[in-house]
């Protein structure tokens, strides 16, 4: 009677004791307070749907091909694909931990059987099953962390592609700007060379002082040196682009020689609400998923401190052959149902829980910092874009005015009404204004590229959630 009461007591109290061990993981979502509106002006007349492949609007088919080629050979994209595969494998392993495991065993031997007192051949085969019953959700929390990190890895794959597209677009814009400035430098060198030639003829005829002719020759030499330096910079940019894309350099130079249409003034638009743009940033999404994964790992670490329940079983068959007689044996078992209760581990489990909590705090801090950084990057790109728009008309007017002034001064110099010093001064200002206009056009395109990258490159968080299925992730990795 006493034994029966004891069994009843433990059977009643054990579920209550287990249920009392509640696991309280930190929140999977960390609240943030992005600004309600952008402080910098937004670009107008662009389309929100044009962000994903905005570079197709530039009228530069070469850029489209270069970006596709760079994304195909980029080590960053390949690394992101590898991390998706790693995260997928971790997810499969974490889900498998929730299921029973089944192992097959087989063996055969021949020797002296003590029970039969003779030589016998023994063979046996069986199946061994085991299952850890996830009482406190440790394995479920591990699976949740794996799911979150897989979603984050998929987002980072898109970010890698966005980074490559932005880098190639920036490098191509820099190269085309360099080539435009090279044309300006070569025209200037040709003009100064002609001035030096005419000054030399005038000097030999006795109409120009030797010092003035020397100034013209020095100016021509300076222009040649500047053109040579500019050509070197362009060659360096070409080789950088070759390394990014894997193109052959002769083919790239041939394509660069073809004329390209001027880029439109407005390429795309972004959402008016900062929260909407933040939702399209893959790095912000990954940081958010890392917080959720760290939260799940805290729950898993806490669950390791509580009892664990496992169930095992087996089924098998054996046969023994001795002296021409074969004996068959079949066995099966269910159990034991084993309960493991941690009593003392020197504080190891508590320390692991504290470490998981510290990682969660770190992930939450990094997530908030990532949100602030994303807002700052968008704001900075908008400011640069607005600044280039405001300066464009003035820079164009200045370049046209200084060019007209130089043409007039050159005509006066040819007629003997202006000195060579006046001509060179007008030339310097015209050259500086023309180079400034070319640089401003590059700066504006660079601002568009920075805004494209800061706005997430057209990524969609809802699409990322849908891509959490194995088939979708495999398709994306390809």
Walk through the language-model features, giving the residues of each:
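Periplasmic alpha-helical coiled-coil/stalk elements that build and connect Gram-negative outer-membrane
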Residues: 139, 155-273, 384, 388, ...
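Small/polar (Gly/Ser/Thr/Ala-rich) solvent-exposed segments
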Residues: 78, 98-120, 130-161, 179, ...
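Short loop-to-helix capping motifs
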Residues: 60, 73-76, 132, 179, ...
């Amino acid at each position: 009677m006493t034994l029966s009461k004891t069994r009843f007591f433990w059977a009643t109290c054990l579920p209550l004791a287990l249920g009392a061990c509640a696991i309280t993981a930190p929140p999977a979502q960390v609240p943030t307070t992005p600004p309600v509106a952008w402080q910098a002006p937004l670009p107008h007349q662009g389309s929100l749907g044009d962000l994903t492949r905005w570079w197709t609007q530039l009228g530069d088919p070469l850029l489209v091909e270069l970006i596709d080629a760079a994304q195909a050979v980029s080590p960053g994209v390949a690394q992101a694909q590898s991390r998706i595969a790693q995260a997928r494998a971790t997810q499969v392993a974490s889900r498998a931990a929730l299921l029973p495991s089944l192992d097959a065993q087989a063996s055969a031997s021949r020797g002296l059987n003590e029970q039969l007192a003779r030589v016998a051949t023994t063979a046996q085969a069986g199946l061994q099953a085991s299952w850890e019953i996830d009482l406190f959700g440790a394995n479920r929390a591990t699976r949740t962390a794996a799911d979150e990190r897989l979603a984050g890895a998929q987002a980072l794959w898109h970010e890698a592609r966005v980074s490559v597209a932005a880098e190639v677009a920036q490098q191509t814009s820099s190269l085309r700007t360099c080539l435009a400035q090279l044309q300006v430098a070569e025209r200037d060198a040709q003009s100064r060379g002609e001035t030096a030639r005419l000054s030399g003829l005038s000097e030999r005829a006795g109409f120009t002082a030797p010092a003035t002719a020397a100034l013209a020759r020095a100016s021509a030499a300076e222009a040649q040196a500047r053109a040579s330096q500019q050509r070197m910079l362009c060659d360096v940019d070409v080789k950088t682009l070759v390394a990014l894309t894997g193109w052959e350099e002769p083919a790239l130079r041939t394509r660069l020689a073809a004329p390209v249409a001027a880029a439109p003034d407005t390429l795309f638009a972004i959402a008016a609400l900062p929260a909407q743009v933040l939702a399209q940033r893959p790095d912000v999404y990954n940081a958010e998923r890392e917080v959720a994964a760290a939260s799940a790992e805290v729950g898993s670490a806490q669950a390791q401190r509580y009892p664990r329940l496992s169930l095992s079983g087996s089924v098998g068959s054996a046969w023994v052959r001795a002296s021409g007689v074969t004996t068959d044996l079949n066995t099966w078992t269910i159990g034991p149902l084993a309960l493991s209760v941690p009593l003392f581990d020197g504080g190891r489990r508590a320390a692991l829980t504290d470490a998981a909590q510290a990682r969660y705090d770190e992930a939450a801090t990094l997530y908030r910092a990532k949100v602030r950084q994303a807002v700052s990057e968008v704001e900075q790109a908008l400011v640069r874009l607005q600044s280039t728009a405001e300066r464009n008309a003035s820079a164009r007017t200045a370049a046209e005015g200084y060019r007209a002034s130089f043409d007039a001064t050159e005509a006066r110099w040819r007629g003997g009404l202006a000195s060579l010093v006046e001509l060179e001064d007008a030339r310097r200002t015209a050259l500086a204004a023309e180079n400034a206009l070319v640089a401003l056009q590059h700066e504006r395109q660079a601002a568009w590229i920075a805004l494209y990258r800061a706005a997430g490159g057209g990524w969609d968080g809802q699409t990322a959630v849908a891509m959490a299925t194995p088939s979708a992730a495999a398709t994306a990795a390809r």
